[in-house]
């Protein structure tokens, strides 16, 4: 089985940051990425379980995978739909 998270083009460590900082950092990072590139986000703020999927829907990015059973949480975002 392939670990999708290991194949990310970029990684964003948001450990220790609290809302709204993780989403602000994701937005800033994604802005400098090319369409189709992937970003691994690692966070421990429980609010990211709601905020990251919401950000992806609102900004029309694809949430490829997420692991949110226990912290640290991992999200794999692909820029663009």
From Swiss-Prot:
Location in the cell: Cytoplasm
GO biological-process terms attached to the record: tRNA wobble position uridine thiolation
Keywords: Cytoplasm, tRNA processing
Pathway the protein contributes to: tRNA modification
UniProt KW tRNA processing keyword: yes
Coiled-coil residue spans: none
InterPro entries from the UniProt entry: Sulphur_carrier_TusA, TusA-like, TusA-like_sf
Any one Pfam family match given in the protein's UniProt record, by short name: TusA
Main location (coarse class): cytoplasm
Active site: 19 (cysteine persulfide intermediate)
Highest taxon above the source species: Bacteria
GO cellular component, one term: cytoplasm
An example molecular function term from Gene Ontology annotations: sulfur carrier activity
NCBIfam families for the chain: PRK00299.1 (NF001423)
Function description: Sulfur carrier protein involved in sulfur trafficking in the cell. Part of a sulfur-relay system required for 2-thiolation during synthesis of 2-thiouridine of the modified wobble base 5-methylaminomethyl-2-thiouridine (mnm(5)s(2)U) in tRNA. Interacts with IscS and stimulates its cysteine desulfurase activity. Accepts an activated sulfur from IscS, which is then transferred to TusD, and thus determines the direction of sulfur flow from IscS to 2-thiouridine formation. Also appears to be involved in sulfur transfer for the biosynthesis of molybdopterin.
Subunit structure: Interacts with IscS.
Stated family: Belongs to the sulfur carrier protein TusA family.
Protein name per its UniProtKB record: Sulfur carrier protein TusA
Source organism: Serratia proteamaculans (strain 568)
Top-level taxonomy: Bacteria, Pseudomonadati, Pseudomonadota, Gammaproteobacteria, Enterobacterales
């Amino acid at each position: 089985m392939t670990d999708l998270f290991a194949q990310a083009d970029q990684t964003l460590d948001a450990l220790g940051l609290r809302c709204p900082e993780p989403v602000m950092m994701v937005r800033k990072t994604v802005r400098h990425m090319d369409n189709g590139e992937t970003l691994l986000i690692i966070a421990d703020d429980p609010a990211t379980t709601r905020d990251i999927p919401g950000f992806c829907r609102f900004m029309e990015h694809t949430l490829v995978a997420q692991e949110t059973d226990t912290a640290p949480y991992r999200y794999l975002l692909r820029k663009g739909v």
